[in-house]
From Swiss-Prot:
Sn-glycerol 3-phosphate binds at residues 110, 139, 141, 195, 248, 258-260. The active site is at 195 (proton acceptor). GO terms for biological process: carbohydrate metabolic process; glycerol-3-phosphate biosynthetic process; glycerol-3-phosphate catabolic process; glycerophospholipid biosynthetic process. The lineage of its organism: Bacteria, Pseudomonadati, Pseudomonadota, Gammaproteobacteria, Enterobacterales. GO terms for cellular component: cytosol. The gene is gpsA. This is Glycerol-3-phosphate dehydrogenase [NAD(P)+]. PANTHER family: GLYCEROL-3-PHOSPHATE DEHYDROGENASE, GLYCEROL-3-PHOSPHATE DEHYDROGENASE [NAD(+)] 2, CHLOROPLASTIC. Its EC number is 1.1.1.94. Catalyzes the reduction of the glycolytic intermediate dihydroxyacetone phosphate (DHAP) to sn-glycerol 3-phosphate (G3P), the key precursor for phospholipid synthesis. It catalyses: sn-glycerol 3-phosphate + NAD(+) = dihydroxyacetone phosphate + NADH + H(+); sn-glycerol 3-phosphate + NADP(+) = dihydroxyacetone phosphate + NADPH + H(+).
């Protein structure tokens, strides 16, 4: 493959980054995949699959592995960043000196900036400047199913109409992968952060043994919290009824492929936070997101009782069952008031 003819460079060779790279390559595009660990990239190249996360999915011939960041970024103007949210800013700053003059950045990272709770668009602007086109993809996607070619749908939002159209064309596959465009850049970002938090709560409820009624109540009221916060930030509330909101929320709250849900289940069964994280063995985005989302809600004066109780469990040692009872014992409310 020539150095500058790739349709996309993917930054991040974990399960989701690899799955997206495979999907793009399967669509007939030339793709470069880079990861921060050269030994890992060399292992992917030798096996022509991601044996750690997706061992049963071979790489298409048009998927190239690259250990050199400069060469990876020279290969395409389109750069897809798929890294944990707590390193998102650091990775963008690492990329900046190597980006092409015509570069465009899209991310599939879900979450907020660690400590500050800022939206990733603000982190990207600070790291990359005001002129580079930005985009985000988000929605109900488990890496294993996406990589296997199972039917999947996501949402896409961008600051640049041409970039959005190009991304939709690159990603969309009529056989398995449907990409919906959405003009709500804020809402598509926020949904992916809040759903991580609520998924921990849903898992915790199931771990305690509360059953389907309680899980459904948590999903429904979690969606209300997501919508309230999004509206306060200027998002379109209808976004949260779509793929980046309700879609992703239902997926992560109900299926054990979700690390956030499994983490919550372990807490509900009595495991401590550190042991549960160690048992998962991968990043549990919702753990950090809980603190970040709550800080953002407090900054905007938005009531988020589920998020607050989860913060009490994760960071203050509150018992999971006691947190659930605190929610049930709250003052009576009108369901649709300030939804």
């Amino acid at each position: 493959m020539n150095a500058s003819d790739a349709s996309m460079t993917v930054i991040g060779a974990g399960s989701y980054g690899t799955a997206l790279a495979i999907t793009l390559a399967r669509n007939g595009h030339r793709v470069v995949l880079w990861g921060h660990n050269p030994a890992h990239i060399q292992a992917l190249q030798a096996a022509r699959c991601n044996q750690a996360f997706l061992p049963d999915v071979p790489f298409p011939d048009s998927l190239q592995l690259e250990t050199n960041l400069g060469q990876a970024l020279a290969a395409s103007r389109n750069v897809l960043v798929v890294v944990p949210s707590h390193v998102f800013g650091d990775v963008l700053r690492q990329l900046k000196p190597h980006l092409r003059a015509d570069a465009r950045i899209v991310w599939a990272t879900k979450g907020l900036e660690a400590e500050t709770g800022r939206l990733l668009q603000d982190v990207a602007r600070e790291a990359l400047g005001e002129t580079i086109p930005l985009a985000v993809v988000s929605g109900p996607t488990f890496a294993k199913e996406l990589a296997a070619g199972m039917p999947t749908a996501i949402a896409l939002a961008s600051t640049d109409r041409e970039f959005a159209d190009d991304l939709q064309r690159l990603l969309h596959c009529g056989k398995s992968f449907r990409v919906y465009s959405n003009p709500d850049f804020i809402g598509v970002q926020l949904g992916g952060a809040v759903k991580n938090v609520i998924a921990i709560g849903a898992g915790m409820s199931d771990g305690i043994g509360f059953g389907a009624n309680a899980r459904t109540a948590l999903i429904t009221r979690g969606l209300a919290e997501m919508t309230r916060l999004g509206t306060a930030l200027g998002a379109d509330p209808t976004t949260f009824m779509g793929m980046a909101g309700l879609g992703d929320l239902v997926l992560t709250c109900t299926d054990n492929q979700s690390r956030n849900r499994r983490f919550g289940m372990m807490l509900g069964q009595g495991m401590d936070v550190q042991s549960a994280q160690d048992s998962i063995g991968q990043v549990v985005e919702g753990y950090r997101n809980t603190k970040e989302v709550l800080a953002l809600a407090q900054r905007y004066g938005v009531e988020m009782p589920i998020t607050e109780q989860l913060w009490q469990v994760l960071y203050c040692g509150k018992d999971a069952r006691e947190a659930a009872l605190s929610l049930l014992g709250r003052t009576r409310k009108d369901e649709t008031a300030k939804l």
